[in-house]
């Protein structure tokens, strides 16, 4: 039987672009695990996306996942926009390269391994797990240790 896992993610950026981080809460049954990492120069959208990628990568086997994010960019991108981007070879409707295509491709690959139900929650509205992720992401952004090698300044 497929394991049922809940994932909560958030990204943070101190300045946009600037130092950033992600925070993740993974829950299987009643056990919670948190993950966080900080990056020296990135954007808020990249951190929101990377949180989802890393969370799904952390699952050792295909799972049934409820993934909750406060990012409409991530939720709409992976459930709606990505289909046309792939058809157009990672170009937007006006033939421009899709921003953050490296992370969209990674997220698409990880999503294919699992059955993912994407949920949205309003950020900074008292949602327990979202607040936990926000705290983790902000702390990671304040102490960045990694380089976001895929970040490309516009």
UniProtKB/Swiss-Prot annotation:
TM segment ranges: none
GO biological process: DNA replication, removal of RNA primer
Matching Gene3D superfamilies: Ribonuclease H-like superfamily/Ribonuclease H
Keyword set, alphabetical order: Cytoplasm, Endonuclease, Hydrolase, Magnesium, Metal-binding, Nuclease
Annotated EC: 3.1.26.4
Domain RNase H type-1: 1-142
UniProt-listed SUPFAM superfamilies: Ribonuclease H-like
UniProt catalytic activity: Endonucleolytic cleavage to 5'-phosphomonoester
Swiss-Prot/TrEMBL cofactor(s): Mg(2+)
Domain of life: Bacteria
Binding site for Mg(2+) 2: 10, 134
Short name of one Pfam family: RNase_H
Group of enzyme by EC: hydrolase
Keyword Hydrolase: yes
GO cellular component labels: cytoplasm
Keyword set includes Cytoplasm: yes
Binding site for Mg(2+) 1: 10, 48, 70
Localization (cell): Cytoplasm
Cofactor: how and how many bound: Binds 1 Mg(2+) ion per subunit. May bind a second metal ion at a regulatory site, or after substrate binding.
Molecular function via GO: magnesium ion binding; nucleic acid binding; RNA-DNA hybrid ribonuclease activity
Described function: Endonuclease that specifically degrades the RNA of RNA-DNA hybrids.
Family: Belongs to the RNase H family.
Name listed for the protein in its UniProt record: Ribonuclease H
Species: Vibrio atlanticus (strain LGP32)
């Amino acid at each position: 039987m497929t394991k049922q896992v809940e994932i909560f993610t958030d990204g943070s950026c101190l300045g946009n672009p600037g130092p950033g981080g992600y925070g993740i809460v993974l829950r299987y049954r009643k056990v919670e695990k948190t993950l966080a990492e900080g990056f020296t120069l990135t954007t808020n959208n990249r951190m929101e996306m990377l949180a989802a990628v890393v969370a799904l990568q952390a699952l050792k086997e295909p799972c049934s996942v409820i993934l909750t994010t406060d990012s409409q960019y991530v939720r709409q991108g992976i459930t709606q926009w990505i289909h046309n981007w792939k058809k157009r070879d990672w170009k937007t409707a006006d033939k421009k390269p899709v921003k953050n295509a490296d992370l969209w491709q990674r997220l698409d690959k990880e999503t294919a391994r699992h059955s993912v139900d994407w949920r949205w929650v309003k950020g900074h509205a008292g949602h327990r797990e979202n607040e936990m992720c926000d705290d983790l992401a902000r702390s990671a952004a304040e102490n960045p240790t990694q380089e976001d090698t895929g970040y490309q300044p516009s």
